[in-house]
């Protein structure tokens, strides 16, 4: 239409309140998610070694929390696959080759379930993942306005959802998913 003007907003200049208004946030927990998302997007937009290490740390920590939750193996596997579908790096994804003793298999194959209902490669999974958990580094999560795209914002939101353990709480997950759909 000739009478329609499109307003293009620079995403990196918007505040938490701006995003809360644009996304029609109705719950305080969603504001906290937006705050964390903006902190992550400014860190991840650098696309450097530190941001990749932090992504690996967040993914590994989320996987560890799911693995040691009180759920059946099939549910744990589904949640881990969900994490790795939404959040992945070259080092942590479903198709990465994980070296074992005398063999190599994809990370996806490590989650096959045996006749006792356990992961066949539970030890291999644990050893591989714990290499990426880094609780010693003090990560800079301060929001610094820097150029990013809506796709970068979506990635940051996905990492926010896994880092806050929202997969483990149905109520929180529902609120977070509503925010994800609006974005």
Language-model segments: residues:
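P-loop NTPase motor domains
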Residues: 1-183
